[in-house]
Amino acid sequence: MTMETISQQQTKFIGHRGCRGTYPENTIEGFKKAIAYGTDGIEWDIIVNKDKEIIISHEPFIDTTYCQPLNKEIGFTKKNLYEMSTDEIKLIDCGGKFYERFPNQEKVIESKPLLVDVEKELLGYEGIVLFEIKSEPSLVTEYYPNPKEYADIIYNHVKNSPLKLNYIYMSFDPEILNELYTLMPKERYVLLEYNPFKCFSKLKESLNFTPHAFGLNYKIITPKFVHKSHKENIEVFAWTVNEIEMSNELIKIGVDAIITDYPNLIKHE
């Protein structure tokens, strides 16, 4: 892909964790609703549990701001998902509790799904799936497997996945991306970053390969960064954009994908 090809592409719109603004995040129904809004793709987050199964979840722990036990009398006996079995995780409701940050979110009892179950429900889906791998070096062994083991778990699952061709792998942790690239050098990867002081060259140097894209907090994206990325055939993804005016500004400077909690509002005109 050349710089000219990149610049001619239409900006893509991606539903962040499904459609978090209106439906509980990282749920099968949320992904389906985002797709129904006409998005170019959806984004989800993955972690690994005690059984070494891949769970769709943004946090490696139970976030009580939006999750609650199905049985309130028993409550939570554990909160670290890496120490919990699949059956234990099914007893967590992450949709029925009022979520102050997203007051218009539909309230429905929803559990954190297994990746394999999401894939079955989305069989035949042709859009993009941004497959974000949650990992923090300081939390490895306590909340996450080490990067090599983590990459092996992901690889052994996705190599036979019906959505394999849809996936674009993302992470804030360059080490997990480097490990995955060793196993799957033909796949697409996105390095995520929120630090405004991390320059283009430092981002590139953290990887052993040239990524498909850099995914930046929209507040730190500049026309200069977009131009420099495109010059090296690297796309730029913006997260998380929830205002139409900001979306339009990012489109003007050539951002390739906009990730939003409100795919019902931030979309193709």
How would you label these PLM feature ranges?
Residues 1-269:
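Phosphate-group recognition and catalysis centered on beta-loop-alpha active-site segments
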